[in-house]
């Protein structure tokens, strides 16, 4: 008999603790071993129960969730899924939690808490399941390294400056899910200001993508923004799919443009990585590079194969550096990947490949 995933739920709301327990205990492969109203109680329960996964509210009394997470990841690293409110402040705190080492997050519904949380049961269970298999990392000073890279002081970024690449024809197309917010940061921060345009589909709910883009914009040398429907796609810019819509690449004459769609979810996701990759295969062909990063499930695998068949060169993040090696594994298994790279070397390999394309970049 397979051992169940032990989950400790930390939330100052008794209702949320009860609902989380109900949802998790309804799954055949997991159970709540204990609940705690605040981090101080949780600290003792961690010692007592040795849970496999912690769900943690971001805002609690006695000790802030971020303070607790920072101490936890330094002293006793373990998989953590954050439980966040759908507010601007909540999104900023959640993104900071992901920087500190949380594996993923699930949002609290704004209204009808009980019905809303029960509707989230499948998503919550999936995230707990993925977290139990995730590689937990210690991340002592992410801001310092990223800020240095953004201002040209990081040693790893220097070689990229020597290869300025300005071309409206070249594009970098990126897809990610669980663990992707930090992976995307690591890919984008070394890019030079004149890098080709980057289009990104990251599985993230509405209300979080704008804060995510703003945070990256403050760390990167390229401009990062949430994509808007119909805007021209320009070099030196990264465009992140809004949490409520699919992002597609389209063309208007000789120009690339961003197209947003409210079509139904694909692979249970909107935005979907497959949708973005397929549009890049159709409209960019050999002019694009495809990059699939850490994530749960198979979204993006089929689309990356379509990009490769259309002439694009494709990358996948390697297993050792992934938080969850799901999407890259599926893409590799389908034969859609040309190069498997560690996250720490992904930007350099992308820029080296772009430099080698030269005159072979073609208008499609």
From Swiss-Prot:
CDD domains given in the database record: CheB_Rec, REC_CheB-like
Superkingdom per UniProt: Bacteria
Keywords: Chemotaxis, Cytoplasm, Hydrolase, Phosphoprotein
Coiled-coil regions listed in the entry: none
SUPFAM superfamilies in alphabetical order: CheY-like, Methylesterase CheB, C-terminal domain
GO BP term (any one): chemotaxis
Residues the record marks as active site: 177, 203, 299
GO terms of molecular function: phosphorelay response regulator activity; protein-glutamate methylesterase activity; protein-glutamine glutaminase activity
Catalytic activity annotation: [protein]-L-glutamate 5-O-methyl ester + H2O = L-glutamyl-[protein] + methanol + H(+); L-glutaminyl-[protein] + H2O = L-glutamyl-[protein] + NH4(+)
Enzyme Commission code: 3.1.1.61, 3.5.1.44
Post-translational modifications reported in the UniProt record: Phosphorylated by CheA. Phosphorylation of the N-terminal regulatory domain activates the methylesterase activity.
Keyword Heme recorded: no
Domain CheB-type methylesterase, chain residue ranges per copy: 165-357
Residue ranges occupied by any Response regulatory domain in the UniProt entry: 6-123
Disulfide bonding pattern of the chain: none
Keyword Cytoplasm: yes
Enzyme class: hydrolase
Cited PROSITE patterns: CHEB, RESPONSE_REGULATORY
Role: Involved in chemotaxis. Part of a chemotaxis signal transduction system that modulates chemotaxis in response to various stimuli. Catalyzes the demethylation of specific methylglutamate residues introduced into the chemoreceptors (methyl-accepting chemotaxis proteins or MCP) by CheR. Also mediates the irreversible deamidation of specific glutamine residues to glutamic acid.
Entry note about domains: Contains a C-terminal catalytic domain, and an N-terminal region which modulates catalytic activity.
NCBIfam families: PRK00742.1 (NF001965), PRK12555.1 (NF009206)
Assigned protein family: Belongs to the CheB family.
Name of the protein described by the UniProt record: Protein-glutamate methylesterase/protein-glutamine glutaminase 1
Organism: Burkholderia mallei (strain ATCC 23344)
